[in-house]
Each structure stands twice: as structure tokens, then as C-alpha cells.
Amino acid sequence: MTEKQINVPARAYGFPPDAYDPSLLPDFDVSFLRPEDLEAFIQALSAPDTTQPPDDGLASPRSPSARSFSSFDFTKRASSVLPDDAQVVAAHAAAAGGETAPIPGDNDTNNANGFGNSSSQSLFITAQSDWAPVHEKVVGSQTHRQKKSSRRRKRSKAVAPGRRTRDETREGYLYGLLKWPFLLIVGAWIVGLAVTYLFTRAYIFIYEQFVAWRGRREKLRRNMRATSRYPDWVKAARDLDNFLGNEAWKEQNEFAYYDSKTVRRVWDSLRRSRIRAAQMEASGSQSSSSSNEGKTTPIEDLKVLIEACVKNNFVGVENPRLYSQTYYGTKNLVQNYVDEVEKSLTALLETKQLSMEDKRSIFKRVSANYGRTALCLSGGASFAYYHFGVVKALLEEDLLPDVITGTSGGALVAALVATRTNEELKKLLVPSLSTKITACREPITVWFRRWWSTGARFDSVDWAKQCSWWSHGSMTFREAYERTGRILNVSCVPADPHSPTILCNYLTSPDCVIWSAVLASAAVPGILNPVVLMMKKADGNLAPYSFGHKWKDGSLRTDIPIRALNLQFNVNFTIVSQVNPHINLFFFSSRGSVGQPVTHRRGRGWRGGFLGSATEQYIKLDLTKWLKVLRQLELLPRPLGQDWSQLWLQQSFGGTVTIWPKTILSDFVHILSDPDNARLARMIHEGQQSTFPKIKFISNRLRIERLIERGRRETRPYIRRGSVESIISEDDLRELLLLRGSTNGTDEEITTNDEMEFASDEKAVLTEDEGQFDGVTDNTEGSPLLK
């Protein structure tokens, strides 16, 4: 294929011509979705929603809702299996938890009221009984009380899902009188503040362009932004730091945002202990030295120091301020400390002066204290394609975290990353990937009719077909983890406004199909109707997950699930790629951010001057205040059944490191449009450029974290993936075994400490052919464990 046929744009952003050839994409023409899976999804969507009363006109106004289980609420065919049957309730609960136990009385058919997770066609209610039709008109006179009750029932209309019910609304004469005037006044004030904020940001932009950036420094910045590879960017960033005098700041140890004296003392102690331990091991005198009473060996001193200092943000060494004063790097003392911690951890892992059990205990405690790193990809419709550049920059430097979470559009990118290997991703993250982005291809004559009739612009079934390629077919969260080792997390919000959100991953919903979770996380009201999560059963077929409840866009309530990640995976360092257009406009760091310092007054000034930064901060806080007032006073209406104030009032939109790619005005015009090759190439380039300044900070963090994970991996015995030992720690297993022996046997049957140490030093490998133990080897010499 020639370059003209490939259609390379005028500005290639550093990509070779092959990057614009879609035929070179892995699995380009492969359709992963099976017809049976798509049919199961269609049937799940057509099933009635069990969380809402039926509104199909088939239920009697005087009959209770679908949740009341009177004997007159079921047809004769459904009367054999009532929901109060313990077996039925247990079966439904198991299905909600991801199990596939058969439901008694179903016989491959849902019961009459839509309960259960089967994807077969449901039986709808047509009458209260065979002799009492639902819509039968009663002929005859009514009493005054009956007429009054009938008029009251007519006035009380059914509340649409997501709208405020009578229990949620306030009563009072002043509330009804002042609600709308107060809402209009505050709304007008908010609009005025928003316009003022835009003018303030424009003033700051002009100030920086014509005051802060001019002459030689502007030329150096242009050279830095023109790079497409990280090594080239580092060279340009060093040149800019040298010109601005930032290198002198690195040589000074003192800084208000960390304890420089403690860091200097710990660094020196680590270095001395490591050198002495290496000399002692080389001379082979560790045994004689350890026999001296009242003295500790250097390796023991090193172990104590490591356990004391390898913690999350120890004395402020991971404070983002330490990386916000220069374009590249941090204090020389901090960099030396990170290098020494890495060397000391390596020495503990490779030394022969510690037993394997001691090493295992050390790295287990250090891992719990240090925590993990997660990459969080926000929503943002077509703005989410900037995430490709962020992922590409991290991938090329081998800094892609194992824990990845995505919401809405970010969930689509996260699904691609979590289901592909590094080699596959390097071939996929190119501009030709735009040929697989066809979700918005329909003309206005098609989608407008759909929106008018269904209330949604896009079709859920069509999106399921396209999304299945990004998730490598009907792959579940557990299957993705087993294939790539990455932990995918997708935020989903229930269709009703009061149920809690869920974070789907291989722990909370292992059998949930990824493409269904991505669709649910992208189901913005008015754009895509709420969808049903699907799960994969033991036979490989799909069925509705969690009683067939419907879910919608996760960014409406939890765009960045930092708290859930911390609880489930011990994540305390987050890399957030924030591209939401309604949030990106308000992201402003008046005193600089990681890799992007304030240029004037040697980094001690304010962006746009003090007046510009103060005005920006005041307006932003005032906007937040009035939005909270409207929400707390319950004055905001709920268009499309959603409280839209939560788009701005969530707990956090950023992380330890926040990346916000540089957008342009045309992105807002194409917010619901598919990108072409040229546009996707620019978005990938801007995503990379926004990530390059953060890489040094991320690299220092992941160097230590991955070395700790390596220590845990090499010091644990061989464990088959998916077994109970991979979930429960070794200490917990030992306690369970001891407890079982003490309760079921005599005291002589309890394993002694010596026997336990001998057992922990044994290892075995199960051969694939015979399924027998191939051998047992002693680890007392500190040899590496078999993997």
C-alpha cells in the first residue's frame, strides 16, 4: 500500500506512514461477539425492569406494585412458584452474586413477574385472575367516598424513574411560594459567575502568553512541545530548566514541603548499612558477627531501616510540590534517596544472610505500607480519546500500572488496555485506530427519529456490537485479569437515584462481561438508555447479572472511584487522566503542577499574577457554594431523571498526579463525533505531551513499588493462579490450619514451629503431563523460588 493510499495527513505528529494503515492493526477484521451473546443481550433489554412498577398499562390501578406478593398478583401459571419460597430467594441471591445455580420451578423460563436471571422470554401479567380482567369497567353507581378516592387516584400519576417522589419533596407554603423565584435568581447568579470565570481565564492566558512567555524561553517551550518521544522531551526540558535557573533549586536540600534532615539521615544510614552488609557477605563472616551479644548485623540494621522508611509519602518525599518547581526532576537529595531505597531493597532480596521466610515477611509488610498505584481514566464523550496518548506515553516507558479504572468513555479505553498485552497495545495505539471508532456514524435523520421515540440518541444493541471488539469479545473481568495481569475497574450507577454505585472488577463481579459494563458506564441519560449488565455462566452463555437491574453512566456520581480502589486494592497513589469538558474548564493550578512550574519569579509567583489567581479561586469557590445550596434546599429539577449538580459536586476529580490534556475549541463541536486519522493523531500527541512532565514522578514511585512486588513474587511458594492460596495470605492459611488441628484433633496433632518452618521451606512443581510432583527442593540456601 502506497503512502497516498494510506492517506497520511499533512502533519503526522511523528507517526510513521504505517501508523495510518488500518490493515496493520491486530484483529482488525475479527468479530469477537457471538450471535448467541448478542441475542441474550437483546432479550435482557426487552425484559421488564423489576425495580420499577409496571407501566405497560396491563396492571390494575388498584393492584399493588410488582413488589407486593399477594396471591392475586400472579397468573395461574406463576402461582406454583412464589417469591417467598426460600429456595427461590436463595437462587436469585446466588445469581445476583455471580453464581449460576438453577432456580426452582423455572424450567428454563422466567416466572411471570420477571424475576430471575434467565434470558428466556418473560411471561407478562395480563389480568389479576382468569375471571377478573385488569381493565374491566365496573358498571353501577358509586358512593361519595368512592368518587373522591377515584379522583385522588387520577391526580396521583406514576412517577417516572429517577424523578422525585412525594417522599422526597418538601412541603410548606413558603417552600412552594419561593422555590422557583429563588431558583431563578440563584441560577442567574451562577450564569453570571460562569461568564466572569471565562473572562478571568482568558485574562490569565493572555497574561502568560505576552508577559511570562516571550523571547528565548518561548522558543525553548515550543521545542519541548514539538517532541513526540520522551527522551527528546527530557533533553528539551533540561534546556528550559537551565535557562530558567531551576537546576540551582535542585541542589538545595531545604524545602518546606518535606523533611530534608530526616531524608538526609535515612539516606546516609541506608547507604552505610548496605555497603557494610555487602562487605560482610563477600567475606563470609556473617555467622561469626551474628554471635556477638548485644550487637546487630548490618543486614538486620538495613531491614529495620527499610521497614521504617518505605511507606507511602514518607516524610513528604512524594509530595507533588517537590516535582512542581522544575520541568524535569526533583531535589537531588530526594532522587538520591529513591535510588538508595531501590538498591537497599534489591540487597535484601538477593542476600543470603536472611531466610526466605524473613524475606517474605519483610516484603509483605512493606507492600502493605507502601500501597499500589492506579491509572484512572475519566469520562468525557469523544474527549476520552485523549486517554490513548496518556496510555501510550506510559506504555513506552514501561510505567503502565496494573490497576486501571475507567468511567464512561474512559471505560472503553480501559477495556482495550486491560484486555490486550503490551505488544498488542503498541500496535493499536496509532492514528489508524480511528477506523474502529464508528459509534457516531449515523446521520441526523436516523438518530433524531430514535431519540424522539426512545429518548436516546444511540442504540444499545449497535453499541454492544462495536464495544465487543474493544473488550476482546465477551471477556469477563476475571478472564481479562488472567490474560494480561491487569486489574480492570469500571464504575456503574444504578438507574434508580438512591442505590449505591458499584465498581466492577475481578473481585466484586468476576463473571460480569466487560462490554456490558462499558455500555452501562457510558449510558448518559438522553444519549444511551440504561442497560443490563450481563454475566457469563459456566457453560459460556450469557445471562442478565444482578436480577436484570439496569445501570447507567458512572461519571454522573463517581467519576474517579479513589475510595473504592483504596479499600479493595490498597491504592494510595493515583494517576488521573481528566478530560471531562465540564471539569477540564475549571482545572487550574495557580502555583504550578507536577512538571509545569510557574515561570516567573523563579517559581514563587502566581499564574496570571496574584490578582488573576485570586479572582479565579474566588469565582470557582462561589460557584461550588451556590450549587451546594441549590442541591441541599432541593430546588434543582431532575431533567431526564438525573441530579446534574453531581457532575461538579463529587468528592474528587483529581489524584496524586492529575493529567489534563490540552484541548481546542473544535473538540466541543465534535464532542459526539468520530475522529478521523488526523484528529486522532493530534489527540494522541497532546495526550503524550501532557503525560511527559509527570513521568519522572511516576517513575520514582513505580520503581519502588515494582521492586516490592518482585520481592513478594520471588519469596512466595509456587501457587496455582485461581486457587485459595492466591486469595488468602500464607499467615492466614497457617492460622486456619492450626485452628482446625486444635479443634478436631489432640494436642500432639498440632504442627510445631520447627515442622512449620520445614514445611515453608519446601516447594514443588506440578508437571503438566502427569499431574504429579516433579520434585522437592530445600530453600535454606536462599536460591530463587520456582515460578
From Swiss-Prot:
- Mind telling me which CDD domains this protein's record contains? Pat_PLPL
Locate the region Disordered. Answer: 47-69, 137-164, 745-787
Name a single GO biological process. triglyceride metabolic process
Question: Pfam families under this entry?
Answer: DUF3336, Patatin
Q: Keywords on this record?
A: Hydrolase, Lipid degradation, Lipid metabolism, Membrane, Transmembrane, Transmembrane helix
Residue intervals passing through the bilayer:
180-200
- At the top of the EC hierarchy, this enzyme's class is hydrolase
Q: Name one GO cellular component term.
A: membrane
Enzyme Commission code(s) on record: 3.1.1.-
How would you describe this protein's topology in the membrane?
A: Single-pass membrane protein
Q: Where is the active site?
A: S408 (nucleophile), D553 (proton acceptor)
Record-given protein name = Patatin-like phospholipase domain-containing protein MGG_12849
